[in-house]
Structures are given as structure tokens and as C-alpha cells.
Amino acid sequence: MFETLPNPMNKIKILPLAIALALSGCGSDETTPVDTGSHVASPDWQDQIIYFLMIDRFNDGDSALNDQGQNEFDPTSDKKFSGGDLVGVSDKLSYIEDLGATSIWITPPVANQWWDAEQNYGGYHGYWARDFQKVDEHFGDMESYQALAREVHARNMFLIQDIVTNHVGNFFTYDDPYSYDPSLPCQGFRLIKNTLPAGQELPYPLNMNECKTDGTGSYHWTPTITDHNDPVQEKTWQLSDLDDLNTSDPEVRAYLKESYRKWIREVGVDGFRIDTVKFVEHDFWNDFLHADDGVMTQAVDTGRDNFLTFGEVFETSTPYHTEGEEKMLTYIGESGSPKQLTSVLNFPLQATMTRVFASGQPTDYLRFRLEKMMDMFPNPYIMPNFIDNHDMPRFLSQGSVNDMKQALITMMAVPGIPVIYQGTEQAMSAARDAMFAGGYREDGNYVDSFDQNSEMYLFIQELAKLRTENKVMTRGEMKVIGSDKAGAGVFAFTRTLDNDEVLVVMNTSNSPMLMNQLDVEQAGGTVFQQQIMSNWADAPEQLIADENGHVTLELPAKSAVIYSKTSSNQSVDTPDLNIQLAQDWEGQTITGDIVIAGSANANEKLNLVVDGNLETAQTITVGADGQFSVTLSTRHFAIGEQQHRFAIYSTEKKAGIEDVNFVSDLSWSNTPDDTIDDAGDAQDGMGGPNGNYSLPTDPTFDKDNSQLAINKAEVFTVGSNVRLTFTMDKITDTWLPPNGFDHVGFTIFMDLPEETATNLSELPKINASMPSGTWSRNAVVFGWQSSIYNTKGANATTWGEAVTPAPTVTVDKANNTISMDFASDALGRPDSLDGIRFYVTTWDLDGLSATYRPLEQDKGPWSFSGGASDESKIWDDLPIITLSE
């Protein structure tokens, strides 16, 4: 079946004590000894599974460290330290190991700025350094870090440290970034007072932070980035007002190199995840990593000849394009000039998996993304793959558990290094919730979350075991052999290594789907044995290829199965239904309904299955004369040029004709069905139900032309599809959001006449009720997310159950319009749009946590003001839109 791969961790080599001691002084005057057991040989990284954790939010092992007396500790606040530490990580190594992870990636353990009064936020996360060479007091000390490394290596596991070179904390600022003049770099510059408690200070050269008019020094004397599309700002301005290091300065480079050589030399770190890579000039990476006094030399000196460096180049790609990959590729390469990073985090794949699995978009998007991954990157087998992380909304905030299982199967089964973000194995839905009892939880339920018998823990454990024990899962060639272009549906791929093969099949749709005559490229009679299944308890234990090497399956909604090829061979009989079509529709383009006619066995019961959807399959009764005809309706087809498939199929005999591929070309009218004029309100920096709310004070919120104000809405309909186009006061994309706009989020409530049984009047999370009537589904659309939820489980604090497909978003920044297309399936596939109602509201959501920004009485940089926290979070809204047909 499989060629079994011995546990790769059994091959770990701990360097002899004599070598470790000899290396303890390399490149440093530091006297801290190297712990025995700290230095081990590098693994083959493609065989690894990484568990990523935030130190502060993972586990509290030493409560004496929690409160340092500076009002920086508060487990009830998402902004402050919660109490996790390095001892806590050591205490839970068995939990991580038993899950199946073989490496641990921790957030930066270095000493941080504890509180930034300017941003009203804390440095619990580790990315706001004040000293790159010390362990933060909340996390422990050098001894506890060395102990963690020693214990990790004793378990035949590996340790990856998150590092930052682009910036430190927020110790200086500019009062008005929009008036910055590069020729006068110190104009508007201001050192921030009381950024560090008494007794703390910045080391040299980080303490050289008085602005220099000649532009030299330890920092770039620039304000916060106002335009992420500007390459100069990207490389030299401040990210989120964090002081941007002048990484071209020799003293800064020397300090950073020695800082990170130290963690390899004195702790025994096995790899670096590198933060904010794209904000630093390319030449820096060549020097920092590959110079004689660089990181890689230190790694080799400690016996690590395959030290992994993977960077955060936060770039995604639109469907069927590769702009993200192209940017990422410029930072990879350990040969040629300049040498740079080993690898990068696979953001384009993550975004595509979210589109396909959580939002119900075409599975062919994933086919394209995986093929480009294999074609474009020099070694995709060592690219870390992930479904979410600490800097974005959790997968489960926008998708279901079954959606996430499909994403995890994909992540574990495609080439690359799987990365499991802490809490995924406990089905967490909040971005930075603590795992330990008493740590911060968004829902206020401060419970322990280390259940090793939870559904997701056991599921990931099973996947990890399959991957770790079989070479084909880590090293096999990949080929996508099935995908749907019209929407959610079938996705299938293989991994092949020598005589071993894995077949992965899944259905991303809410409906049962026909995987029709999938070519598995094997000889007829080849037998595949089930290994793992999701959401399909009675999935076939074996699949047998027919005489043509094809497999046909009726896949339940949201199901997935992994099969492995066996050495067995069985014969299989395929019924002959004698189906012949009267017209060849293959490759044809249609602009409306068509009639499909043909012949088959007399009186046969058949079905017209369009786009594989068995739930909407039309029954065909063949006449006594052997003739049949059936109308294929385009009412529920998406707008634009779309590729489809249909089959004439017998659900009774599990056989039919091969899929016929065709194209539909439907278009929106240039004239809207309805127009709603909403200009004049929610402007001039004021909004809310009574016009008394004020915008957050951060300068990226436009007080004159608010991004949250809707001036006009237009409604377009074709068949059962609806487009809502909003003309906004202003559209910005300051933060390069994947959906093309930021500083506004739409919550749109839909009242669907065909879904009234569980309707609600309360509007989740925004402290309001429907102006009239009730709602059936709600769409949440902002720069980083597009999702639809039904009312199952919905209440004042919960959106409900995620359903697909989500609205597709199109932005025309020049004309200040945002269009959202609601496919027929998003509206419950109605036969008529008559009576469907939309209630549209705006507010801003945090792109990290997918939570609505707070409403407070007092002004703040990231909170709305002028109201109580329990008042409605609606900046602007529209009168209820009622459709008629």
C-alpha cells in the first residue's frame, strides 16, 4: 500500500558535549554557557509538521511572571498580557507531540515594549522589541528558554523562533503622517514619553532614536505608512507607527546579526520564521543571513547545515493570477545573488483555501493555485502551508468545522510543511484566544482548552500520523485530477511516489455532488483503500477503477476521503445505458435555457445532473420509443462567462455518460432594477442612528469623506442572482486588504421568504434589531472576509452557522463603488426573488480578529466614540430593500 517512512525524528543527532562547549564562544563575548543538548543536526524539513503558538496565549507555567506591576497584565483584555510563558510551553510538549507535530514555532520571546499608550495596545505578542538579546520578563529568562530547547530536542522535535528585523516598538511618532515632507524628516517628529517603565532602557544602537536631519542613524525618520502601494513607503516608512529600523546602517546590521546568532548559539534554535520580510530591502537579507558573520554561518557552526528560514511576505493572489507568488519569489533563494531566504509562508494558498472551503468559490481556483505553486517555486516541498494564523480571522470565524476539515486535509496532503496554529485542534474561532484557563477569551469563557479527546484534536492526530509515516505524503509528485469551474463541488488530486499513490477526493458544496468518471490514471480494476474520511461515515472502504481507469462517486455535502492505491486488482462491470445525445454540446456557449434531447434504453429512469449537483438533478423518463428531452435552465447560473458541465446519469445504476463541458455567458444589465439615494447622512466624521458617533482618531480614517458612508445603492438582478452596488463617500485600501477596501465593513441581513422557520429579529454583534420583520441569513463583508451565516446558533454575540457561497466582491476605487454579487445558492436557490429583503449596515471591523470595533464615550485611535458600549454599532444604513419579480 504505502512505503512506510520511519519516524524522521528518530534520526536526530545531538552534537557531542565537547563540540557544544567549543562553540559556546563563537562570534560573541557573551559568557552564557551553551546547554548540553542544545545543538542538534537539522532535519529534512519537508518531513516536518509545525505547531505554531503564541507564548502569551498558550500556557501559564509560572504565574509569578504574569504581573510586572505596570498595569500591563489583564487576562480580561485582548490588548494586554495574559500570562503564558516558556515554562508553560515546556509543560505542554506532550500535548503538542501527541497531536503529531514534530516542530514548534513560537512567537518572539524577546523583551518587548509592554504598553503603547499612543495605540492603546500592548506588546504581549512579542513583535514590539525593546531588546532583541533578552527574554521578556513575562516569558521567563535565558535558562527557561534553554530548558525548553533541551526538552524539545529530547523529544526528537525542533524549535523555530519568530524574529523581527524591520522594526522595534513605538518610541517615536509623527503627528501628521499625511503632511510629511521627506526633505524635512524631523518636522512633526516627536519622541513619545514614558514608553518604558523605570529601569528599562533601549540598548545601543536602538537607543539612538533622536531624529537626524541628514537622514542617517539607526532608524528611518519617517511616519507611519499611508500608502502600502508605494514601494518607498513599504521599505522605509513605519508599519503601524512602529519605529522602522535603518537596516542599511552597518551598526544596525551588526546588532541584528549578533542578536539572532545568539539565540542559535546559546539556546539551540533550529530555524527562524522572519516577520515583515517585504518591508526590508533585499540586500539586507543577503548580508543578515549569508555574510561571514551572518545567521547561516552560526547555524553551520552549531551543526545545523539545513537551518530553515521562512519569511512573512503577506501577499495574496486573485483567482487565476499570480501577483502574490511573483512578489514572494523575489525574497527566496540561497544560490545566486543576492542570496536570501530558504522559503516563504504560502499566503496565496491560504487565501485560496479560504475562498474555496470557507466561501464556497470554485474548486478550480485551488487547482490553479496548487499548479502554480509547483511550477513557480524552487522548492514547494519546504513552503510552510497554513489555513489561518494570529494575524487574520480564524478559519472557523468564516467557515464550518467540515469546511475546516477539508482545508486541513488539503494542507496535510499537498507538498509543503503543514503549520497548525494553536487552538485549531480545539476548533477555536477567535484569533488570539488563550489556550489555558484564566487567559484571555473573546467570549469571556476562561476555560482550559487542552482536550486531547476533542473531535478536531483526534482528526488532526490521525492526519498527522498518516503524513508522518508515509513518504508519498511528504515527497510524492502532486497532480490535480478533478475540479469544478462553476462553483463549489468536486476537488480531487493524487500524490505519487514510485509505486505508491494517494488519492484525495472531496466535495466542497452544501449539496451532494457527482464525481463523474474521474480519470485516476490507473489501469482498469485498480483498487484504492480508504485511509481517512470526513463527514461521510459510510464512505466506500474501497474504490475500483473501471475498464477505462475512471472512478464515479456520489459525494455527500462537505465530505472528503483519502484513499491509497493497493496492489490488488478487481474486475468491475459498468452498465450500458445506451445514451446518445442528439446534439453535441461539448464546448458550446449558451446565453439562455437549452433543450437537451437524445436516446437511451426505452423506459429508463435517468437524471440531468448539472455541475454535478445531485440535489437539483432533474428526472428524465425515457419514452417507449427510446427518446427523451429535458430543459437545462440557466436561472441559477452565475453571471459572466462561466464553465459548466452536465451529465445524463442514472442514480439507480450509478452510471451515465461522461461530463459534457459547456460555457454560459450571462450579463448584468447596465440599468439597475432599483436605486436608493442615501447621500447626506453619516458624513463629515459623524454617524450613527442619531448622528452623534465620531470616527476613530487614527489618521487613516477620513473625517471629511468617511469610508463608512454610503451615498447610493443600486440593485441588479438576473435570474436568481442579485448584485448590490454601493457608491461610497470614499474607498481606501491602505492596508492592502484582499477584498480591495478597508476602514468599512458591511453587515447585510437578508429576509428570504422560503426560509422563515428560524428567522430572528435580533442583529448579532451590533446591538440592534431589524427595523421591521426578521432575517434569515446575514452577510459579513469587509477587507479580509466575505461570509454568509444562517440563524442556526445565532444570538446577540454569535453570527450563526457559516454557509456558502459567500458574496463575491468587486471594487472600482476610481468611482468609489463596491459591488457584491449574491449567487442564487447564497439566497437559498429561490425560484423567485419576489419579496426578498436586504437590510444594509456599515461599521468597521478589525482585520485581525474579525470583530467590530468598540464604541466608547471617549475618543481613541481604533474605537468609535460618542456612545455607550451597548448602543448599536451602525454608522450608516439603508432603508430596507425589497425585491420584486
Model-found features: residue ranges?
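Structural beta-strand segments of beta-rich domains
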Residues: 590-596, 720-722
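Active-site-proximal helices and loops of the catalytic beta/alpha 8
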Residues: 149, 167, 258-379, 383, ...
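Carbohydrate-interacting/catalytic domains
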Residues: 2, 11-20, 25-52, 67-71, ...
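Short, compositionally biased P/S/T/A/G/V-rich stretches that sit at domain boundaries
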Residues: 567-590, 668-712
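Substrate-binding/active-site clefts of carbohydrate-active enzymes
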Residues: 42-48, 56-262, 266-267, 287-299, ...
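Short, well-ordered beta-strand segments enriched in hydrophobic/aromatic residues
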Residues: 501-507, 720-731, 818-824
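Acidic/polar low-complexity flexible segments
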Residues: 659-681, 751-775, 827-885
